[in-house]
């Protein structure tokens, strides 16, 4: 990571696709964001959006198979870009009116202005982008 304040700063973490790893990912990303995003509420929104993407990947893409996921974030003087890459299988779920499921994508789109999802036979890539300041 480049901490000089000039150029790109990078966060890169690979982890097993199991629920028990999600807390470690949130903790590591929170520490990285603390040095980059000055507005605490904006940093929390980013953290929550990434947490949703990772949780969706673990629960729906990998379904707890324990294979690896990768979170990579970059920040320059203008924005933060975060990419979550998995080798899981994308499944489209219909939202059921009386369940708590199916809100993760909507939540991500509410928290950060740019959410792009690409799926293929080899996995899913979720890209999030937001300005440094809210």
Task: Enumerate the language-model features and the residues they cover.
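Conserved short strand/loop->alpha-helix "switch" segment adjacent to the catalytic nucleotide/phosphoryl-transfer site
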Residues: 26-51
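Conserved beta-strand-loop-beta-strand hairpin that lines the nucleotide-binding pocket
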Residues: 1-12, 16, 58-134
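Heptad-repeat coiled-coil signal-transmission/dimerization helices
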Residues: 22-29, 108
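Conserved polar catalytic motif of the HATPase_c/GHKL fold
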Residues: 52, 56
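Conserved catalytic/ATP-binding subdomain
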Residues: 20, 41-44, 67
């Amino acid at each position: 990571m480049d901490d000089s304040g000039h150029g790109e700063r990078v966060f890169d973490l690979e982890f097993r696709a199991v629920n028990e790893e999600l807390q470690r990912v949130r903790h590591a990303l929170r520490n990285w964001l603390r040095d980059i995003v000055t507005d605490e509420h904006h940093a929390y929104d980013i953290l929550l959006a990434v947490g949703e993407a990772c949780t969706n990947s673990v629960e729906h893409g990998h379904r707890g198979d324990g294979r690896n996921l990768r979170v990579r974030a970059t920040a320059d003087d203008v924005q933060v870009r975060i990419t979550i890459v998995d080798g899981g299988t994308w499944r489209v779920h219909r939202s059921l009116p009386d369940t708590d499921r199916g809100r993760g994508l909507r939540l991500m789109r509410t928290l950060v202005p740019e959410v792009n999802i690409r799926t293929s036979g080899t996995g899913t890539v979720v890209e999030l982008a937001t300005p440094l300041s809210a």
